[in-house]
Amino acid sequence: LQGPKAQAILEKLTKASPSEVPRFGCVETEVDGINCLVSRTGYTGEDGFEIFCDAADAVNLWRELLKRGAELGIEPCGLGARDTLRLEAGLLLYGQDMDESVTPLECGLAWTVDFGSDRPFVGRVALERQLEAGSPRQLVGLKLLEPGVLRAHQRVQTAHGEGQVTSGTFSPTLEVAIGLARVPAPVVLGQNVTVQLRGREASARVVRPRFVRHGRALA
């Protein structure tokens, strides 16, 4: 249940106070009389909630959410819509924007590694070496400057070598094609690059890999 009206809709079905659930927090409560774990999390870049319940209760709960949320404009959506939202928000997809061959330093997730702790962990030595020497590649955002749609695996040509689009789509919010790409580290924000787009070359601009948050354009 995601979006600016998620809280108001959830309040219709539970005695708990959704506004008091902190971001990334959770609470055990009843939703429409069904025992649930409700977390203030999501994969859309919007405020919202994820509701966990027994599989046997899921269909009835889904239908009740749609029924009670109708007057507030609730709409069901699928993975395609969610993927567009997460890409607009710059949220990575494992197996596409990152995998076991990509370090956190190469995909904008260095903040998840606690280098300040003395605690050993698998890969620490290698990451510390990369941190000191500098990562040879980085994850950036792209905005296409001409008609077309960015898609995964398209080749990106920069002044410092080649890269590759990892995720791409058309952004309904920005009304332009956007994507995430892994490119050489020397590439900087604002530079133009060339993307191989279905047999032709198209220009794109390098931007921060976060395009939209809470419905507001960032790039």
Residue spans of the language-model regions?
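Conserved, structured C-terminal
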Residues: L1-A219
